[in-house]
Amino acid sequence: MSELGKTFSQARIQRGLTLEDCERDTRLSRRYLDALEREDWKVFPAPVYSRAFLRTYAQYLGLNPAELMRVFQAQTEEP
């Protein structure tokens, strides 16, 4: 797990939330929330889903979606 996944996981744990809590509150499947925390991008059906879910999860956890999107794009862009 690198910076992005750790950021999500640490924010969730600091708030005392389980993945089940996050699933209920965001209506995002636990499978996708777990994939965000593990940075397992192949779980998502298309890149648009990973970006949208990343924004939603970041906002829910009180994180800066724009900053995390920049990290995501840097990690996933092709050389």
Question: Which residues make up each language-model segment?
Answer:
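Cytosolic/nucleoplasmic/matrix-facing N-terminal domains/tails
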Residues: 1-79
